[in-house]
Amino acid sequence: MKFFLLLSLIGFCWAQYDPHTQYGRTAIVHLFEWRWVDIAKECERYLAPNGFAGVQVSPPNENIVVHSPSRPWWERYQPISYKICSRSGNEDEFRDMVNRCNNVGVRIYVDAVINHMCGVGAQAGQSSTCGSYFNPNNRDFPGVPYSGFDFNDGKCRTASGGIENYQDAAQVRDCRLSGLLDLALEKDYVRTKVADYMNHLIDIGVAGFRLDASKHMWPGDIKAILDKLHNLNTKWFSQGSRPFIFQEVIDLGGEAVSSNEYFGNGRVTEFKYGAKLGKVMRKWDGEKMSYLKNWGEGWGLMPSDRALVFVDNHDNQRGHGAGGASILTFWDARLYKMAVGFMLAHPYGFTRVMSSYYWPRNFQNGKDVNDWVGPPNNNGKTKEVSINPDSTCGNDWICEHRWRQIRNMVAFRNVVNGQPFANWWDNDSNQVAFGRGNKGFIVFNNDDWALSETLQTGLPAGTYCDVISGDKVDGNCTGIKVYVGNDGKAHFSISNSAEDPFIAIHAESKI
């Protein structure tokens, strides 16, 4: 009995790091600003058949409606209440999405905005997605309800009430982030209200949460809230399962708050990942792909089993958040596909793929003055995600997760899951290759000259279909074929002018 108790205790301690994905699924996608009805359809028609593990959804709670500028994406990060009522849909639509996605083995992870409410300067009234009244001036949010007792006004020690110095951890946690009213998360009443909201979502069937602005909350306050959370719904999850937690902590080094303070609560977003990988792919600061041999902890990244990794996210793809100009996005499609391919092939971290929408970028003095633009819409009503005959998306939805190269690398990651990093090769420059045990092999050419090499793949002999240039269809290959000999070696030729200068083969792409 003692042994059993110890085991269950260990299981409980580790549970918040487990994404509870269906067996063999390893990557989630952020369907940024998608409507619940579209996500439900996407789970059934695309994500499940292609082996995606789950979806990070935009904040589902009621938020402020901002008219100047007109309906920006960031209004969803200014809560008014915890009613499930946003431009992505109402509670019935949310429930239907969670049901339908779970039923095909695709998990839902909610972006939970629990550090703050709306901005201090917002006008009192009912300009909210569900019409709830609020008055920021006197801290009145009857939709929760919160009042003046529930905010950190008295605790913050700066004259402005806002964060003025990121070298002061207390300011970062107790003062207002960008003028947003900071909740007093050390108060049990506030913790209970936040936990009630999250428990409502857990009972509906979500698998976990991205905790927005975790850097701006004390790790102990987060833990106190997590301790109040229900186990996951046993309709889809095994008894005693705890919600998967990944905390948004922007830590590029050199500040008072560090990611490792949060490891006890769950995984943490590793913002260094995309910033550093972007520099390598762009060949900035003398970086080159050959240096990626010890990618991961060897590059000063957090422990792999604590990291949630991504090439870009909804913030830094438009210059917000962290990472700066090195971040690769769909605007840099060729390098972006290579970077996402590298991420999905490499064993480090738990991976998230971005799915974006188009906006009219307009750089003035180095800043995109349209970085606020919200999702494709008709008079503020979010447009449906239409699907074109070639399986790309219409209505200005980018849908990177539907790009063949990215979709097929999600499958690659599933196939090689658990296999060791192996058979590294590089040319001391920007041509590199590596394998995952005897299940997969990938080759990159990011140099300005052709690659022509015979490499040890570690794979069994046979003919393989390159899943970057094509697909395995009815036992044949629509792309490049790779011939692996009895010695495990194969010859690779990649032109530096190829549309996608990388090749990937795996056990299930064998013809």
From Swiss-Prot:
Pfam families (alphabetical): Alpha-amylase, Alpha-amylase_C
Subunit structure: Monomer.
Primary localization class, coarse: secreted
Enzyme class: hydrolase
EC code(s) of this entry: 3.2.1.1
Cysteine pairings via disulfide bonds: 43-101, 85-130, 156-175, 393-399, 465-477
Annotated gene: Amy1
Cofactor(s) needed for function: Ca(2+); chloride
Protein family per UniProt: Belongs to the glycosyl hydrolase 13 family.
Protein name, as recorded: Alpha-amylase 1
Sites of Pyrrolidone carboxylic acid modification: 16
Residues the entry annotates as binding Ca(2+): 115, 173, 182, 216
Superkingdom to which the source organism belongs: Eukaryota
